Amino acid sequence: EVCTYFYANKQSYPKVLEEQVRASVARTEKQLGKKLGDLKKPLLLSVRSGARDSMPGMMDTILNLGLNDETVEALATSSGNARFAWDCYRRFIQMYGDVVMGVQKLQGEEHDPFEHIIDSYKEELFPKEKGEIDDNRLNVSQVKELVSRFKALVKKRAGSDFPTCPWEQLWGSVGAVFGSWMNDRANVYRRKYGIPASWGTAVNVQAM
């Protein structure tokens, strides 16, 4: 119903939706003892499609929502693995930048811009090595540098900063998943398998 409303009302939401989402997030926070944006025990979320009929790989997904320059430090502490935390953050920026902010390969570019940054940086770090260099060879400070370069790319391509507010991240992600219902690959898939566009999709928000 929300998806149908979204497309019928210039990609806006029913007035009751924000209250319902906030109430659902609050219940999840209480159950897990974590809080969205908290600096000690941050709640991280995934946002993905809940289409009536399975459409594997066709719809957009966001993982590790809730990470920013502060909550990533809390994840590093709670996990005992700073590199893991910063790599989650790096991947979140890449995913959000692509899906929500439209930072994608431009006409004439051979590679995804985020992947190009990774490859170029690894060439800087390991200039004498040939062939593919495993991302796992990057240490935490080097992953932090990727985060910085990713955010600079988002600013340059999207014209705005990567959002640090988890609620802004959440609403951006919800809109992107609804928007992906009508993307080219989803339309082609529905035509092939006889899935009506009028069905729309749910958006599932879950704890990581």
What are these regions (language model features)?
Residues 1-208:
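Nucleotide/phosphate-binding sheet-loop regions of phosphoryl- and nucleotidyl-transfer enzymes
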